[in-house]
Structure formats: structure tokens, C-alpha cells
């Protein structure tokens, strides 16, 4: 009888241990792979943002902070996160979020160029839409070496910026922004050339 009681106690302890282990495993899985984002939001991490600043921006938008800290530590995210514009979608888990920040899987932003009277005004407008500040943008817009690189001079560089809406990575450098606008300028005029009627077409119409 005593022997049976001991066996029952051992069985109860075993079942309890299994139950506790299963509960811990479920909590662990939920923390790391459960939904950490409840609603869509845009996360902007500047190149001037440090890791505490990243966490300050991220925490109000997500749950499961303990799990994020554990996984981020494993990825050494504090030393390797990439700045950028990131979209947090409902249903994302902390593993996906941490990997997104480590790999720099940012979402482009729409940059709208309107008619600008001066380069200073253009730099100011762009600084509201990109991570670069107006001083950095102004240096690129007046850089004679960069102007020569894109086939113009510092006085004519301003004319490359055709009013339209473009997609850029939020962290694009001012220099790469200018290089891209040169390509957009060439694309615009090439398209216009091939879609405009020729003098022969006009004479026969």
C-alpha cells in the first residue's frame, strides 16, 4: 500500500512537472512568436538615434518587451541596428521586428517635390521628408564636385529637380538623392522625347 502511494506521489510530481514545463514553453512561445503589434504604425529611426532612443520609440508600439530584449541581445542589435523608416504591421512578432531592424528592411517613403524658388527652400522642404537635415542637403545642392559628377555645374544643378512625387529610402544620403534626381531628370526628358509627336506627324495631321 505504501509502495503504491509512493508511486502515485511520483506520478503526481511527474505530471505536475510536465504541466509546469508545458506552461513555461507556451509562455515562451507566446512571448517570442505571439502578436507583438496591435495596430499599424510608422517607426522612424534616425541615423542620429542611439539604442535607448530606438527602444523609446519602439516600446509604445509593441508588446512582449522582455522577449524582444532577450532576442535583441542574441542578435547584438544594440551595435547593429540600421536606421530607417519601418512599418510595424499587426501580427508581427518580436523575432520579425528585431530581424527587420538588424537587416535594415525599411519601407520607402514618398517624397514630394513642388516648385522651389531657391535651393535653401528646397533643402528645407526635403529635410521635412528625409532623415538628412537642411544643412546636409544644402551642401549637396551647392557642391561643385557633385554637380560635375552628374554632368552639370552647381548653378544648373537646381534645374534637375522636376516637381513630382518619388519614392526614396528615408535614410538616403543627400549625395545619392542628387544622383537619383539626375536619373529621374534624364528619364523624364527621354520619355517626353519618345511620346511627343514629331514634326512629320504634325504636318500630316
Q: Model features per residue range: what roles?
A:
Residues 2-196, 200:
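Conserved catalytic or metal-liganding residues and their short signature motifs at active sites
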Amino acid at each position: 500500500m505504501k509502495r503504491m502511494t509512493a508511486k502515485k506521489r511520483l506520478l503526481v510530481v511527474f505530471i505536475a512537472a510536465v504541466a509546469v514545463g508545458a506552461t513555461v514553453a507556451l509562455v515562451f512561445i507566446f512571448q517570442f512568436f505571439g502578436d507583438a503589434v496591435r495596430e499599424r504604425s510608422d517607426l522612424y529611426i534616425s541615423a542620429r538615434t542611439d539604442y535607448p532612443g530606438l527602444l523609446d520609440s519602439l516600446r509604445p508600439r509593441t508588446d512582449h518587451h522582455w522577449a524582444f530584449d532577450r532576442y535583441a541581445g542574441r542578435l547584438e542589435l544594440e551595435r547593429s541596428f540600421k536606421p530607417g523608416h519601418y512599418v510595424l504591421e499587426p501580427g508581427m512578432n518580436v523575432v520579425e521586428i528585431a530581424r527587420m531592424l538588424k537587416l535594415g528592411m525599411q519601407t520607402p517613403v514618398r517624397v514630394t517635390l513642388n516648385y522651389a524658388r531657391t535651393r535653401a527652400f528646397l533643402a528645407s522642404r526635403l529635410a521635412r521628408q528625409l532623415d538628412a537635415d537642411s544643412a546636409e542637403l544644402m551642401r549637396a545642392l551647392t557642391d561643385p564636385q557633385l554637380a560635375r559628377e552628374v554632368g552639370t555645374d552647381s548653378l544648373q544643378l537646381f534645374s534637375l529637380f522636376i516637381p513630382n512625387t518619388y519614392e526614396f529610402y528615408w535614410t538616403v544620403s543627400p549625395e545619392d538623392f542628387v544622383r537619383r534626381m539626375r536619373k529621374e531628370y534624364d528619364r523624364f526628358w527621354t520619355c517626353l522625347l519618345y511620346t511627343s509627336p514629331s514634326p512629320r506627324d504634325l504636318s500630316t495631321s
